[in-house]
Regions:
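Active-site-proximal specificity loops/subdomain of glycosyltransferases
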Residues: 46-82
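N-proximal low-complexity "stem/linker" segments adjacent to membrane-targeting elements
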Residues: 1-24
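C-terminal catalytic/acceptor-binding lobe
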Residues: 163-240
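Short beta-strand-to-loop acidic/aromatic patch adjacent to the donor-nucleotide binding site
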Residues: 84-95
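Conserved donor NDP-sugar-binding/catalytic core segment of glycosyltransferases
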Residues: 102-129
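Short beta-strand/loop segment that forms part of the nucleotide-sugar
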Residues: 33-44, 59-61
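Short, acidic, metal-binding catalytic loop of nucleotide-sugar glycosyltransferases
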Residues: 20-34
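A recurrent flexible, glycine/aromatic-enriched loop bordering the glycosyltransferase active site
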Residues: 129-149
């Protein structure tokens, strides 16, 4: 029986969101593998809700304000030290759809690559959006952080979360994917949309403008902040 650690950074999101994420993890286990949910609190579990869930939780006491990168790093180290066979990541407002993990597991039974899925898009209220997937994901040039199944063979490559500069944390998934590519790791794609992704990004609402939330994120503004950081001469030594 293989052990899979599913790592979630938690920043006191609505209880119903983390509850759905947690329930989706527990429903994945079968006679080949067991999924265990590790929730790392970015600060403190203010309302003490995690004790209501079937999970292992850990509080960092301080909020690191880096888009969950520090909690992912701590969770990754914990999973490695506890000798898990696979690691996955799941944001607190997302959830695994039926058969998500099994579909990925079947791709890499030889553990010779990292398995990846596509996303299905939902509003923050959980309404299905008419949006297929970002074009770079469909072209296999990007993978969302919540879409990986990573075997133990590749654990030595993956814990870079704490090294990502805080001003670029909104791009952490792209930096992570780029790093894996530099390591020449083989990706295997299920091409199934089995990760349910609640989105605040404007581009995902182009066919459902009536569902667009007030606190929408504009990709161009996020990109501008990241570009400003990367092209600032004072920051170049970070990447040397």
């Amino acid at each position: 029986m293989k052990k899979i650690a599913v790592i979630t950074p938690y920043n006191n999101e609505d209880f119903n969101l983390i509850k759905k994420a947690n329930e989706s993890v527990k429903l994945q286990s079968n006679n080949q593998f067991n999924c265990e949910h590790i929730i790392v609190v970015d600060g403190q579990d203010t309302n003490e809700v995690l004790k209501k869930l079937d999970c292992f939780s850990l509080e960092l006491k301080e909020n690191y304000q880096d888009n969950g990168d520090t909690p992912r790093s701590v969770g990754t180290n914990l999973a490695i030290s506890k000798n898990y066979d696979f690691i996955m990541y799941l944001d607190a407002d997302n959830w695994f759809m039926k058969n998500h993990v099994n579909t990925l597991f079947d791709l890499i039974k030889l553990e010779d690559g990292i398995a990846c899925s596509y996303r299905a898009f939902y509003s923050m209220e959980g309404e299905k959006l008419d949006y297929l997937e970002d074009s770079d994901c469909l072209k296999k040039k990007h993978v969302d952080t919540s879409c990986y199944l990573i075997p133990k063979n590749f654990f030595k490559f993956i814990n870079i979360w704490h090294l990502i500069p805080k001003p670029t944390s909104q791009w952490c998934d792209r930096i992570f994917f780029h790093h894996l590519n530099l390591m020449r790791i083989q990706f295997k794609f299920s091409e199934k949309h089995t990760l349910a992704f609640r989105t605040l990004y404007q581009v995902h609402y182009k066919n459902n403008k009536n569902l667009m939330p007030k606190n929408i994120k504009e990709n161009s503004k996020i990109n501008e902040r990241v570009y400003d950081y990367f092209f600032d001469e004072n920051n170049q030594e970070t990447f040397n």
